[in-house]
Regions:
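N-terminal acidic leader/helix
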Residues: 1-38
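Short amphipathic alpha-helices in soluble, non-transmembrane regions
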Residues: 20-23, 50-58
Length: 58
């Protein structure tokens, strides 16, 4: 079962996350508000673990 996860990043980090999500074939939506990018990702447990590890490094 997939859950929605929300993340807010600056534009530089958002570009990096976007490339990572595309490489992992993870479904997401992104919207911009001034200098922040808001991501909504639909993840299962294993994908959520991967993204959390990536965000810790970022």
């Amino acid at each position: 079962m997939r859950k929605a996860y929300n993340v807010t990043l600056n534009r530089h980090d958002a570009k990096i996350l976007k490339k990572y999500l595309h490489a992992c074939k993870i479904v997401f939506e992104a919207s911009a508000y001034f200098d922040d990018i808001y991501f909504t990702m639909y993840l299962d447990k294993s994908e959520a673990d991967l993204v959390n590890e990536f965000l810790e490094v970022l």
